[in-house]
């Protein structure tokens, strides 16, 4: 996992399956409508500034790595409040015209949801973007891309 550390800095969704925790989530996203136009980072990291993006990405990523290495992963992963807030911000960011002009739901923030002043996007759109899958065992035969080599391409070129 450390040899593939560089993959975490980019936006390639295959970096999210360096450990098996995200395999079912990757597989169900890959076969869903969002896979055509979005990456994991489009929904799961903040986009308001680059510092917040990489701080959040590093913190969240280390949490996933820690849980994987210490075998503490849950059967069904749920976003913690901080992650849920980012996900909701990104739903509204990408679907701004639809949310604010057509159905008038985009004015609700995740804090409003926490105060019972509205619903989160996924309260109605439960199957977006990962389908009906809700646990690690619900997609036991999930196929995901595996890297050809754990050695990054730039290092392979230096060694040759």
Regions found by a protein language model. Give the residues of each.
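Short sequence/structural segments immediately N-terminal
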Residues: 1-160
